[in-house]
Each structure stands twice: as structure tokens, then as C-alpha cells.
Amino acid sequence: MTNLIHRQNHKQRPRVKTIGLILLKILVAIPIALIIFPILLLPTTTSVPLSIQILFAMALVGWLVTISRFGFTVRIVLVEIAGFVAITLLAIFASQIFASTPPILDAQGRAIPNSIAVMEKVKLGGAEEWVTIRGKDSRNPVLLFLAGGPGGTQLVTARRALTRLEDRFVVVNWEQPGAGKSFDAVDRSKLTPDRYITDAHELVLNLRQRFGKEKVYVLGESWGSALGIMVVQRYPELFQAFIGTGQMVAFLENDRICYDFALRLAQERGDMKQVAKLKQQGPPPYYGNDVALKSATYLIETFNYMAKNPAIANQGFNTLQDLAGSEYGLYDKLNFVRGLSDTFGIVYQQLWNVDFRKQATSLEVPIYFLIGRHDVNAPPKLTEEYFNLLTAPHKELIWFERSGHNPWINETEKFVDTIVNQILMQRGSVELLP
């Protein structure tokens, strides 16, 4: 009997060893799968040519076949992982190198004469920052787009939503320091609103010289609308007009309204956990390292509310689609998110004292506010108050009845038509868009 049990145990040991080896290989396969995951994104989310993608696929398979011949030991596993890391890093590098903005083509797929579609670095304040420059005719007026944030990147979003602006403008989309492709352009810990203003000024001087324009238009959305006011206030001689949408006016009052709104929403739906969280952190202002996290607690509530509001026409951004845009390499896609956490937290706490109702009541350029009626992220009542106080050579407050914080997304057609068929017509001669 003892011998029988001994023989059974002897037979079970190889099975246990085999099962253990299989489990160990599965455990090793999990981090390897995570390591090579970026390579799997190349075909659908980057501009890396197919031939280069095939080379990376061959490298992965070749390395796997080669290393598997040497057995399964700790040393071999470490070498295997190191090889996959090296291949993945090369793939990430390739995605950065080949990132580009799509060409502007006619119906036959040919490049349009005099068109421009480039993505390039420009030196601003001693740092290399990125821009896209797009337009069907490089002789058209120049329009500088200032993205939301701070830390936000909207290269792909703006290209897709505002494509028709390229018919009448040279549209320049600036990747601000600490955002997207310019995430590492500067020491983010030292970023200030003034740095954005001076960089924008230097960029405009560059654009004037490059395109032979005395003045440019500026379109700012959300944070970009506040930055735009600051820039045109300091350098009015450089601008044909300012267009603000999702207009930020007074940051502290704005965010306290958002906080109260979010708290009320949570109370109405009986979400006591969210109520407790909001009450624990209290209303803004916030300072320190968790500004972005605390601000997100109520700002996400406002965006979720607008996303569910049937009065708003187009419910907003397609973040996954934007992340898949050809302008972003794989590292840029990571910084798409990092900018809205790291950079936002650093800069936003420096904006609590900004109130244009006190600090910018007189501007020397034509002003246009394109405002969503249902915006609960930048309350329109603050924009109305500012508009009534403001003196300018020309000013208009234009309502978008089916929009929230982003009329340029919610009512794209009307937004573009307003800029081209109304604003551009007033400021200069141009044919109406069909």
C-alpha cells in the first residue's frame, strides 16, 4: 500500500511541475503583453507607414522565436522582456517621428495649389513648441486657435470640427507649453500665465512675418478664451479681432458657481457619497498638488450634465477618436491626459484672481463672444456681465441656442458660418460660404 501511494505521488509531481510552469509562463506573458501593447496601436492610431509596422511585427515574432529556443529561466525571461522593451521603445519613437497632419486635397485626391498643411516646431521663449498650420490658400487671413486647458490639446478636435474654417483662413493651432506635443517643452513647475502670453506674442510675430499679414485673428475656447483676452489686451496692434467661446471671465466666481451646481446635482440624485466628497474638499480656491483632482470633482459633474441635456445638439467630444489622430505619436497620446492633470494643476491655481470685469474693461480690438445658451461650465451670466461692462471698437454677443460649453462642437456649421459670413465679412472683404 505504501509503495502504491509512493508511485502515485511520484506520478503527480511532474503534473504539478507542468501546471506550475504553465502558470509561471502566463504570469510572464501578462507584463510582456502590456509592454508590446503600444506596438499593436500603430496601425489604427499613428502615421507610421505600413512597411515600418510590418518590420516591427517581424521583429516581435523573430525575437519571440529566437528567445524561446533558450529554455525558460529567470535570466532568459529578463533578456526576453528587455528585448520586447527595446522594440516597443523603437516603435514609440517611430510614432513620434512619423506623426503628421493630413494634407489638404481636392476631390481627386490631389494637393490644392497654394494650400498649406504642416505640423512643425517653432521656438517660443527659447523653447521648441508645436503648431499645425492648415489652410486651402496660404494667402488667406491667419487665425490663431487657442485650445482649452490649461494643459489641453485640441489639434485633432479642431481640425475635424472646424475644417471649413480652412476654406477662408490659415488656421494655426498652437500646442501650448505643457500640453500634448509641447508637454515637455518647458519646466512645467515654472509655468505662469505670463509665459503663455509672451509665447503667444512671439508666435503671432512669427506668423505675421511668415504670411505677410499686419494683423491676425484669434479664436480662444474655454481657458484659451481667457488667454486670448490677456494677449489682445497687451498687444492690441497685432489683432484683427478676438473671438471667444466658452468664455472664461472670472475664474474664482466661475468655479464656485460650478461647485454649487455640482453639489446641488449630487443632492438631487441622492448621491450622498459625492455630496460628502464635495463638502469635505469645500469650494475653491484650491492650492497645492491636488488642484486638478479637486477641480475635476465638480467640473466632471457639469460636463456630464451637459452631455445628458437634450437641449444641446451635438453632445460633445469623441476623445478616443481624437486620441487616434495622426498628429499624435504614442508618447503624445499619453501627454494628452497628463497635460490636463499636471499642467492644469500648476497653472489653474494662478488664475483665481483673474476677473476681466475689473482687469480688462476696455479693449482696443473688435470683440465677439460666441456663447452656448446651456453652458454650465462657464456660466453665460458672467459673460453677459462682462460684455455689458466692456468697451471696444466693436463688440457682439452671439448666442448658440443648442450649445453648451463648446458651440464649436455642438453647432459646428453655425459656428463656422458666423465666423466667416459675419465676423470676417465685417472685418474684411470675403465671399460668403455656401
Where are these regions (language model features)?
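Conserved alpha/beta-hydrolase
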Residues: 166-183
